[in-house]
């Protein structure tokens, strides 16, 4: 006899800072725009802990559009 699929509970893992709801978190947004790509990197105030890192290439599929202003806007919105 076939067994039914077992349902697995998904655990949500938060890698960012632990804050209460409605509380603000401050960070530093480092933006590097090269001729080939745009990087948006958010760190804590000391610059040692990364909170988020997004590139234009992560948002665009075509290599020629990685460095476009549209890809940089999508990367900034993802942060």
Swiss-Prot record:
One of its GO terms (biological process) is translation. Its main location: cytoplasm. There is a cross-link at residues 59, 61 (Glycyl lysine isopeptide (Lys-Gly) (interchain with G-Cter in SUMO2)). It comes from the Eukaryota. The modification Phosphoserine is found at residue 14. Keywords: Cytoplasm, Isopeptide bond, Nucleus, Phosphoprotein, Ribonucleoprotein, Ribosomal protein, Ubl conjugation. It is found in: Cytoplasm; Nucleus, Nucleolus. One of its GO terms (cellular component) is nucleolus. One of its GO terms (molecular function) is structural constituent of ribosome. Belongs to the universal ribosomal protein uS11 family. Component of the small ribosomal subunit. The ribosome is a large ribonucleoprotein complex responsible for the synthesis of proteins in the cell. Part of the small subunit (SSU) processome, first precursor of the small eukaryotic ribosomal subunit. During the assembly of the SSU processome in the nucleolus, many ribosome biogenesis factors, an RNA chaperone and ribosomal proteins associate with the nascent pre-rRNA and work in concert to generate RNA folding, modifications, rearrangements and cleavage as well as targeted degradation of pre-ribosomal RNA by the RNA exosome. Component of the small ribosomal subunit. Part of the small subunit (SSU) processome, composed of more than 70 proteins and the RNA chaperone small nucleolar RNA (snoRNA) U3. This is Small ribosomal subunit protein uS11. It comes from Sus scrofa.
